[in-house]
């Protein structure tokens, strides 16, 4: 059984072990769905041609990838309404639709278009939500995500996450690229490219910065990069290894792992850099910190009990409390936004699987199926979990519903995607 020191070494060099070439954007594949999905039909919007396919197809894709909806094909019903008065409700009820999204696109002058939509309840025949957006045609995709967010919230009561972003690392030959994209894998942008490994991207709470680890100086150094300007600064470049950055909920601090004292230990630094405060004094290895949503606790991995397990400790120091008790190897903790659920990686029978644990009852369930999954993180509404996993010899991303009932796969055609992190609601 590998020790935690072996695990750490694997984390720091994992990016060097993945080969292949990568295309810029991720391709999405929906895999199954839960039994209690809401049946909805998103009809073609009137005159949506100027959006160049970036409106209703995007809305449908968003709703499908959430795992909360079952899409009814609008072409199966002999009714194409653009206004509520044109809806033939008995036909849609017979097709199994619980709600309908209808809309239209009009010229707004000055090179802009006005996109209007309504979400109608098929049984009560009333509007559930709706809105209007006046934008240039090249903003149609963002409007589609916003409409999907409104539909998601109207049906589930939870805030939608379709206008959030993902961060991940693409590996192509000897090149590493830190990228961000829409939640559906589109509109990808390269933030940093290097011939040395880039690992552990971590979003600031306001979504304006990303912390990550770069090996460009021949050792791991923690950097923070401004996404708007591209400017970056080294915030942890102490003697030895600097790794595993995690933001505090208010964005003022980072927890990092340093080896200045020998073994890997957790330190707290200001987000702008400066002196490091050691969180605990332990003879073993402590690593992979993650703040609780209220900022009062730091969850982490330690071998102090002999095998890697997850613990928590007050942010100002104190006695650590063990959190995971099932399994002999539990790593990579992340907390749900409400602080009630922990996701992590458990090794069992040689497989590395994403687990979800209720912190009140300690009940756990398995979310992933592959033999090697890593780096789980929650969507900002807590309803989905993003992680990387193996699929046919390729490293890809999966997003699973928090109850494990549905998942989607995001992959490049001929490359590897690794170290994912789901961004916050505050999308600049």
Swiss-Prot record:
Pfam families: PD40 (PF07676), TolB_N (PF04052). GO terms for biological process: cell division; protein import. Keywords: Cell cycle, Cell division, Periplasm, Signal. One of its GO terms (cellular component) is periplasmic space. Residues 1-24 form the signal peptide. The keyword Cell division applies. The keyword Transit peptide does not apply. Its main location: periplasm. It is found in: Periplasm. The Tol-Pal system is composed of five core proteins: the inner membrane proteins TolA, TolQ and TolR, the periplasmic protein TolB and the outer membrane protein Pal. They form a network linking the inner and outer membranes and the peptidoglycan layer. Belongs to the TolB family. Part of the Tol-Pal system, which plays a role in outer membrane invagination during cell division and is important for maintaining outer membrane integrity. NCBIfam families: propeller_TolB. This is Tol-Pal system protein TolB.
